[in-house]
């Protein structure tokens, strides 16, 4: 640190120290002053080489600048007295010190130091932090008050006029003392920073006044010097000779550079603020590079190291040590040399191409997007508004463009403000493209044109040092495509509409991607950075009965919708238009990879008004991620075949996004995973198309022999869950007669390959138009592979129903097709809502084939190895007086789908005729749900040799019950206010209720165990409801559960009606018996009340090792117990005295100074 301050004294003791702060040191350095005035990114000449050799300029030797000491050491040492490798390295180090302390200004020193800090490792940074703390502690008390003001919440006062030195000094002090995490104070200082446009105007005023007046004007210089001496910073008195009274002097320019440099590097500012400040700093540096003060530096002195530090170092402005030295060294003719040289060396424009014209949504004017080719082989894309372009051409000097060019351009631009029917020319875009492509060289190489197409404003874009993802993507794509197409090609037009064009009101123009999505493969990186959704235009298939028209409609992909700030929010439409849009359109947003789902993704079905056939391909949307569409509203619909005059209609489409996000009339389908394809079937139409992963369509008419009509069957769409490794198909619900939605959720184990296969002549009840007169309310069947939380299903709010399940059958695969007959009579003109995700009516689990073998993902029609559970007849009936109680309007049946083993014989199994206890659905009026099966002999049970499929297992579904107790009371319907279950007897064919029959051979537990006549029935497929919803699979237990009916507390029936509900011991989540004993089960002679499984609230797992006790004293523990916390036997984890395992978790970062010893307990992996 000390050597950096006094490098000449330590290196050359015989030479007097060049104290730059003394005014008498002006004449000593001689020719060293011009290099210190450098403001471009070129290394200055080495100042220490001239110091030991006296006042004359040094002989021409290669300048060192910031060259690495290792590379330039031998060369430097050869020409120096006492040269050598070590001495040369020392001298190079001293040259760096002197260059840093004497040549660089404050802004460049800070930027250089921050660049060096980025090259240090963390331990070096901590060491440097300690050194900085020690150095900063010396001035802590002096700067304490200023630091409190900088980080406080009080208003710093009026700091608007940046021309005042006191204002600039206070801003610099506040930025220097601002804490690294004080975002609030940083935002306040960001608002107080000067506007870069005002600074540039002041610089231009300084340049104009300096060219007219005398630079050596003593009165003005003295005033400027007196004003600048009051400024802050480490500098003492600023320079005085070059500034004028109305402009900005050297000291003010350096302070402004320091101000913007500190703000752009300060960690307290946000990323967006720092990027914006960096752009302002670059504009300020560009303006200072063409200042007249850098005219005298010979270009030959820097030929060797011109391109080395072009981007690393900043503008080399004179520091405080050299400010007074340079005042007497500037000649008079230096003011006219610099502009020509800067103009000669500047990068100019080689070609301007008009990419596209788009009407703005905020007003009726147009936007123009230009592709600019620069002389340094860079390509930028700039979007200018109609007003900006017109004002620029009107203010253009005469010498830069021809008169005919101006007249033609302005004539075309004036037509841009007119409507299309009022224009004389049919299209404006070809005219402007031709005019800009044939621009004269004087127009292209002028400074005003270059600054116009390089400027950064609120209405334009710029790609130099611009971190916007759209422009980065545009620049990358232009480099990839510059040898393949012209600006008027279709691919660039698509890229123009999808990427380059800037959205001013948060709305996206339409892009017609009719060829394929392959030409948008480069947009993948853009979608990850912008919030947007992909929408599908559906109006083209509204009234078309042919599927080939729908193929072109499905390929219309609109541009992404960029999420802008709250300033650019959309203006609301009148209420009349909003209501009209609500009634006419109900759009579905994209969720993952172009899949159409509603914005509020609920699980219950409702009215669907979208009757179009839309096919969304999983990989054709070019990289849309799930994080975009989760936080984005529904995107507007844009028809690619529409012209530019339909922007007003697109405005109305876009402004209705916020209403659709909360629209309850959207079709809602939710599953455990993503859905990759969408197929909507329209009942009146005769065409169905199933989309594959590749975007292909498989068409087949519904009127053929493959799809025989079922006269009483309403159209039921199917929804495939992502439960297995197979491509899924989603069919949104079509609209019925009165708008009621019909939906069938079919998980992956249930195959729907019968929709496209015709080898079996059995009727398929999934597809087919409804011909019944009473089909305004349909039955919704929901089959889920695993239990899901019950609030996702609506429950019935009507009086009690009795569901008759006749001849439940399971059919294994036969031949090449599978059948899913769902026959619904005309009496079932309601929505049944029976059961919930916890309800296990027909649990069929397959140890061998579950969840199905993976098939090709591109074929959604491929069969799975699982089975189809068919309901031949489902008749909802009313208990008691059937004519007086209204039917419910929302009834569902939940069937957990599963498959049978492939090794099972192809025979139909019939369930035994024992009554079926159903699930409880708590309703608002506390009704009773009675469920029964058809009467069949009990001896027709399934033998173990045939199948392991048990009969329908009743479990309990609590739902959002008003009662806080999970247990269900068992009283009569007249005296009980909560929902309960009454298991009734069988019903005959005409659905009349017969008296209740006994519950089977084992009436105490309800299980068809080995204590009765059904001893052959093995029970290894009963499961408790899954406490964690999601695509999880559990295999059945390897051992069958023993009977617990003899002598346990389960045989203590205490229900009032004599019928005891079934109780089942589910599979334990732990196989080693580490679950605690039940509390109530330990009490002797206690009749345990059957409780509903609140799987969605908390898991209820009874003890797995409960053994029957003949004395009736309760269950016993089988074997010794152990604690999983400490591993010691004899107690459970809840009684463990040791600390919990979770409390001992430590961090993973370790400092390793040497290899650990062999018995070390270091847990780091080999990578560390």
UniProtKB/Swiss-Prot annotation:
Q: Which chain segments does UniProt annotate as zinc-finger regions (CCHC-type)?
A: 1121-1138
Return the Polar residues bias intervals: 932-949, 966-978
Keyword annotations: Metal-binding, Zinc, Zinc-finger
**Regions of compositional bias (Basic and acidic residues) in chain numbering:** 574-588, 636-655
Alphabetized SMART domains for the sequence: ZnF_C2HC (SM00343)
| InterPro entries in alphabetical order | PX_dom_sf (IPR036871), ZCCHC2 (IPR042793), Znf_CCHC (IPR001878), Znf_CCHC_sf (IPR036875)
Q: Does the keyword Acetylation apply?
A: no
Name used for this protein in its record: Zinc finger CCHC domain-containing protein 2
Organism, per UniProt? Rattus norvegicus
């Amino acid at each position: 640190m000390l050597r950096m301050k006094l490098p000449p004294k330590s290196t050359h003791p015989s030479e007097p120290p060049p104290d730059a702060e003394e005014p008498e040191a002006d004449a000593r350095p001689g020719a060293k002053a011009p290099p210190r005035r450098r403001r471009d990114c070129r290394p200055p000449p080495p100042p220490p080489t001239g110091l030991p050799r006296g006042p004359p300029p040094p002989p021409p030797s290669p300048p060192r600048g910031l060259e690495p000491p290792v590379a330039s050491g031998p060369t430097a040492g050869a020409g120096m007295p006492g040269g050598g490798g070590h001495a040369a390295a020392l001298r190079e180090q001293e040259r760096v010190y002197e260059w840093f302390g004497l040549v660089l200004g404050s802004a460049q020193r800070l930027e250089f130091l921050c660049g060096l800090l980025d090259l240090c490792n963390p331990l070096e940074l901590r060491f440097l932090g300690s050194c900085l703390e020690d150095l900063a502690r010396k001035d802590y008390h002096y700067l304490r008050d200023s630091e409190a003001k900088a980080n406080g919440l009080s208003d710093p006062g009026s700091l608007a006029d940046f021309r005042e030195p006191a204002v600039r000094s206070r801003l610099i002090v506040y930025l220097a003392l601002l804490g690294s995490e004080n975002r609030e104070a940083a935002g306040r200082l960001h608002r107080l920073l000067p506007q870069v446009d005002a600074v540039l105007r002041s610089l231009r005023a300084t340049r104009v006044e300096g060219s007219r007046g005398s630079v050596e004007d003593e009165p003005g210089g003295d005033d400027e010097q007196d004003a600048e001496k009051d400024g802050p910073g480490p500098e003492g008195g600023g320079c005085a000779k070059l500034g004028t009274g109305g402009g900005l002097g050297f000291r003010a320019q350096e302070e402004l550079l320091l101000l913007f440099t500190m703000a752009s590097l300060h960690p307290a500012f946000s990323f967006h603020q720092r990027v914006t400040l960096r752009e302002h700093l670059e504009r300020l540096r560009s303006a200072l590079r063409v200042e007249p003060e850098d005219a005298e530096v010979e270009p030959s002195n820097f030929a060797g190291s011109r391109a080395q530090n072009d981007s690393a170092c900043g503008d080399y402005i004179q520091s405080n040590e050299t400010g007074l030295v340079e005042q007497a060294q500037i000649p008079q003719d230096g003011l006219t040399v610099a502009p020509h040289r800067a103009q000669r060396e500047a990068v100019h424009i080689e070609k301007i191409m008009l990419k596209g014209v788009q009407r703005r949504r905020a007003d009726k004017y147009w936007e123009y997007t230009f592709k600019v080719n620069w002389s340094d082989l860079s390509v930028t894309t700039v979007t200018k508004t109609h007003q900006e372009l017109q004002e620029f051409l009107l203010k253009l000097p005469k010498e830069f463009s021809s008169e005919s060019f101006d007249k033609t351009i302005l004539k075309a631009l004036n037509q841009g403000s007119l409507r299309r029917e009022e224009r004389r020319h049919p299209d404006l875009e070809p005219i402007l493209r031709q005019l800009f492509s044939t621009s004269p060289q004087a127009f292209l190489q002028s400074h005003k044109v270059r600054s116009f197409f390089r400027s950064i404003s609120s209405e334009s874009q710029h790609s130099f040092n611009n971190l916007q993802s759209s422009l980065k993507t545009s620049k990358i794509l232009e480099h990839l495509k510059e040898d393949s197409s012209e600006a008027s090609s279709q691919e660039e037009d698509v890229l123009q509409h999808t990427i380059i064009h800037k959205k001013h009101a948060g709305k996206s123009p339409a892009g017609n991607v009719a060829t394929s999505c392959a030409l948008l493969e480069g947009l993948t990186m853009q979608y990850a950075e912008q919030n947007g959704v992909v929408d599908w235009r559906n109006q083209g298939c509204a009234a078309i009965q042919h599927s080939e028209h729908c193929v072109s409609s499905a390929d219309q992909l609109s541009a992404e919708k960029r999420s802008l700030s709250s300033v650019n929010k959309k203006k609301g439409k009148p209420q009349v238009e909003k209501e009209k849009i609500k009634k006419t359109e109900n759009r579905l947003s994209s969720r993952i990879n172009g899949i159409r789902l509603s914005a509020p993704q609920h699980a219950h079905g409702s009215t669907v008004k979208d009757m179009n056939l839309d096919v969304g391909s999983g990989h054709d949307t070019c990289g849309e991620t799930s994080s975009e569409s989760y936080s984005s509203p529904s995107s507007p619909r844009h028809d690619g075949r529409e012209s530019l005059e339909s922007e007003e209609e697109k405005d109305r489409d876009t402004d209705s996004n916020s209403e659709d996000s909360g629209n309850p009339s959207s079709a809602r389908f939710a599953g455990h995973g993503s859905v990759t394809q969408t197929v909507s079937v329209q009942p009146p139409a005769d065409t169905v198309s199933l989309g594959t992963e590749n975007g292909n369509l498989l068409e087949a008419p519904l009127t053929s022999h493959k799809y025989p009509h079922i006269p009483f069957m309403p159209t039921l769409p199917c929804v495939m869950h992502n439960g297995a490794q197979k491509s899924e198909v989603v069919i949104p619900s079509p609209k019925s007669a009165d708008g009621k939605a019909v939906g069938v959720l079919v998980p992956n184990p249930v195959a729907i390959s019968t929709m496209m296969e015709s080898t079996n002549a059995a009727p398929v009840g999934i597809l087919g138009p409804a011909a019944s007169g009473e089909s305004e309310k349909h039955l919704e069947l929901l089959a889920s592979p695993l239990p899901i939380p019950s609030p996702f299903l609506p429950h019935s709010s009507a009086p009690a129903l009795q569901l008759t399940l006749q001849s439940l059958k399971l059919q294994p695969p036969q031949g090449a097709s599978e059948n899913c007959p769902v026959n619904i009579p005309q009496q079932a003109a309601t929505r049944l809502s029976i059961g919930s995700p916890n309800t296990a009516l027909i649990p069929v689990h397959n140890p061998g084939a579950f969840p199905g073998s993976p098939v090709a993902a591109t074929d959604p029609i491929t069969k799975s190895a699982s089975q189809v559970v068919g309901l031949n007849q489902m008749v909802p009936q009313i208990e008691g007086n059937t004519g007086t109680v209204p039917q419910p309007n929302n009834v569902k049946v939940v069937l957990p789908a599963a498959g049978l083993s492939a090794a099972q014989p192809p025979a139909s199994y019939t369930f035994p005729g024992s009554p079926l206890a159903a699930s409880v659905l708590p309703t608002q009026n506390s009704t009773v749900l009675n469920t029964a099966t058809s009467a069949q002999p009990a001896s027709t049970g399934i033998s173990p040799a045939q199948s392991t499929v048990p009969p329908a297992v009743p479990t309990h579904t609590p739902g959002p019950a008003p009662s806080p107790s999970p247990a269900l009371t068992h009283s009569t319907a007249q005296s009980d206010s909560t929902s309960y279950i009454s298991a009734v007897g069988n019903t005959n064919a005409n659905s009349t209720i017969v008296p209740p029959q006994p519950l089977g051979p084992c009436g105490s537990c309800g299980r068809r165990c080995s204590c009765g006549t059904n001893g052959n029935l093995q029970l290894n497929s009963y499961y408790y409801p899954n406490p964690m919803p999601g695509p999880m699979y559990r295999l059945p237990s390897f051992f069958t559960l023993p009977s617990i009916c003899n002598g346990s507390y389960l045989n203590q029936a205490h229900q009032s009606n004599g019928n005891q509900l079934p109780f089942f011991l589910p599979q334990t989540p732990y196989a080693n018996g580490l679950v605690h004993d039940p509390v109530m089960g330990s009490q002797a002679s206690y009749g345990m009340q059957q409780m509903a499984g609140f799987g969605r609230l908390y898991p209820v797992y009874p003890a797995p090792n409960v053994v029957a006790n003949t004395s009736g004293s309760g269950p016993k523990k089988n074997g010794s117990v152990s604690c999983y916390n400490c591993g010691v036997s004899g107690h459970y984890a809840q009684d463990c005295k040791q600390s919990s395992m979770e409390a001992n978790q430590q961090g993973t970062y370790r400092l390793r100074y040497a290899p650990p010893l062999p018995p070390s307990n270091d847990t780091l992996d080999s990578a560390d």
